[in-house]
């Protein structure tokens, strides 16, 4: 008996991806996924992930620890996007990588079959171009931790040369420039505005036990607001932005702290973190005139919203809140008047059924009762009068306490419950909870 190779994949895998993790990813219904990162991309050669898997060269992880097997390359990432019915967003290596490498990557993904890279793609099993729309020119090139770090002045030239080469291959792609509030943004926006569609911003928040639950939660919306306000200022102060609508792509945002339980940087997330993420979603809605795209970072393990062991997987507390808001909360902002601390309240119309949805976050320790008044019991949406029909449901994410967390292989304790609201005039929300109220219309 001769055995060439033995597969360590579970027998129910789907094209190499774990079925249980794929099911959780599908539940999130994320509209776009960014790959391959992150600090990793500044030392990544996309050619390493092409061709037969068994012949791909393993490489030392250029940014973190361990070895990158290169089992997942462009083809596998695109297949994952197909399985999840989501859009791909590819970051090119603008650190140690060069202009030709980036342009070739665009051609490999989007070029016709008769182009050099298109022919190679066809040889590897994909004749039809993928037509990837979203591309970022590097990652966090403002930081000295980044492979290929250089001065702002030098990177301005590098960004423009990358953009010219990538657009020469495919003028329809949308380019996202590396951003960082301060002098970096001022230089990039002043000198590269004609060579970008969006500008990337990142932020991470730390543990604030000493400041209390509310302080911990409010870190996220305050950072979103800080960045959005900075860009409003740039529009006033930078002549190159006149007449342009270069909005923010917040393609990394999250909490990042705590012990590494799930492998390298594999942190645990608590209910208090989920409340902060919910508050962030409220703030993104309020700042949607400035923020075009927001990508929670990351997906599985590390600082992800899904936690997995070798045998089990589950939504972290942050995954539960992302799933809840994707399923129930609307996307068309509605003005909210009044204030009742400590509640954070936002409202949106759900375009699929014209329901009026409210997000109510209670980052406090006590139950809060508030009055809900929809003026006239109706609203206008897309030249139609929508009247409340009296059917109301409240979805509540909470747990035993603010430090509750979910563990793979165990019953989740941070989870969503659903109940009908009989009285929409007097609404009660429990302590340390994120709530989505859905008001039906006719």
Task: List the predicted regions and their residue ranges.
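Non-catalytic accessory regions flanking glycosidase/transglycosidase catalytic cores in CAZymes
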Residues: 1-185, 189-198, 224-225, 229-251, ...
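Active-site His/acidic residue clusters
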Residues: 203-219
């Amino acid at each position: 008996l001769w055995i060439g190779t033995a597969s360590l994949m579970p027998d129910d895998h789907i094209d190499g991806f774990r079925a249980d993790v794929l099911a959780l990813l599908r539940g999130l219904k994320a509209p776009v996924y960014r790959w391959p990162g992150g600090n990793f991309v500044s030392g990544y050669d996309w050619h390493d992930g092409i061709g037969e898997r068994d012949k791909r060269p393993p490489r030392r992880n250029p940014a973190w620890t361990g070895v990158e097997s290169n089992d997942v390359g462009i083809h596998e990432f695109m297949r994952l996007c197909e399985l999840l019915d989501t859009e791909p967003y590819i970051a090119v290596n603008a650190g140690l990588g060069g202009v030709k490498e980036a342009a070739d990557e665009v051609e490999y993904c989007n070029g016709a079959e008769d182009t050099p890279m298109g022919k190679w793609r066809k040889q590897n099993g994909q004749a039809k171009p993928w037509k990837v729309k979203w591309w970022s020119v590097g990652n966090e090139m403002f930081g000295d931790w980044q492979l290929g770090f250089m001065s702002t002045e030098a990177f301005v030239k590098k960004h423009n040369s990358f953009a010219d080469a990538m657009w020469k291959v495919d003028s329809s792609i949308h380019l996202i420039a590396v951003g960082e509030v301060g002098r970096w943004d001022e230089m990039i926006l002043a000198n590269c505005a004609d060579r970008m569609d969006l500008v990337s911003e990142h932020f991470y928040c730390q543990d604030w036990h000493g400041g209390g639950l509310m302080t911990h939660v409010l870190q996220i919306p305050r950072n979103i607001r800080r960045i959005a306000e900075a860009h409003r200022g740039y529009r006033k102060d930078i002549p190159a932005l006149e007449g342009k609508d270069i909005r923010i792509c917040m393609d990394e945002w999250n909490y990042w702290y705590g012990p590494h339980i799930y492998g390298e940087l594999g942190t645990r997330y608590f209910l208090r973190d989920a409340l902060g993420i919910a508050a962030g979603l409220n703030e993104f809605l309020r700042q949607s005139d400035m923020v075009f795209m927001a990508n929670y970072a990351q997906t599985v393990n590390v600082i992800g919203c899904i936690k997995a062991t070798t045998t089990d997987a589950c939504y972290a507390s942050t995954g539960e809140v992302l799933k809840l808001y994707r399923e129930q909360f609307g996307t068309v902002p509605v003005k909210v008047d009044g204030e009742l601390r400590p509640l954070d309240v936002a409202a949106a119309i759900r375009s699929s059924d014209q329901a009026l949805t409210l997000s109510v976050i209670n980052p406090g320790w006590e139950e809060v009762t508030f009055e809900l008044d929809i003026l006239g019991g109706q609203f206008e949406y897309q030249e139609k009068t929508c009247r409340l029909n009296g059917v109301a449901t409240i979805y509540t994410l909470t747990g035993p306490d603010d430090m509750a967390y979910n563990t793979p292989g165990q019953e989740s304790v941070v989870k969503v419950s659903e109940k009908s609201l009989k009285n929409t005039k007097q609404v009660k929300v429990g302590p340390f909870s994120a709530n989505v109220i859905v008001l039906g219309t006719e």
